[in-house]
Amino acid sequence: MLAQPRAFTFANIEAGMRNLVIRRAETRDAEGIARVCAAGWRDTYRGIKEPDRIEAVIAEYYAPERIRREIAAPEGWDGWIVAVEEETVIGAGGGGMTEPGVAEIFVLYLDPTRRGEGIGTLILDAITEQQRARGAREQWVSVEPENTKGLPFYYARGFEVHGQRPEWGTAPEEGHVSLRLMRRLQPQ
């Protein structure tokens, strides 16, 4: 049985009174997750990757149908965590255990207009809480060296580079790499 991360509620975000909730995704969130992840992927990789590669990744990984299946938390994946404000998904992320004591952040994206508000940190905290409850002592994430949005975010939260590997979905001879970042987690 997966541990349910607690729901965090915040008011007074930015200038107005808004209600922000961090929670496990529900089937009704699939379209919003797809929208946020597609927008985040495009914003992150525009000018770094070819437009056709960007759209191919979005079509494969961020299609609402796929996300609906993933909300059910298949083996190795703990399900999606969402940031919802006024019934709108504004951020989403998820991870899973890759081996005993070792967790991975597989995805974390926000509406690009909402970066810098602490929402990504809240999603990461919820994923981390979920993984610690499952016994994680290490937390890993793959980030491409050109990802000038993701790298500073993870460095600021204690992740350090521990190597590199071929970028997900590419062959080693293509030369595309992802940095492997890790931070140690305190047991619960």
Show which residues each predicted segment covers:
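N-terminal amphipathic/basic-hydrophobic helices that include classical n-h-c signal peptides
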Residues: 1-16
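Acetyl-CoA-dependent GNAT
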Residues: 10, 20, 24-30, 35-113, ...
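Terminal substrate-recognition subdomain of acyl/acetyltransferases
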Residues: 13, 177-188
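Short Asp/Glu-rich motifs
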Residues: 76, 150, 173-174
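A generic "structured core" feature
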Residues: 115-117, 125, 144, 148-151, ...
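Conserved catalytic-core motifs of GNAT/GCN5-like acyltransferases
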Residues: 140-143, 155, 160-179
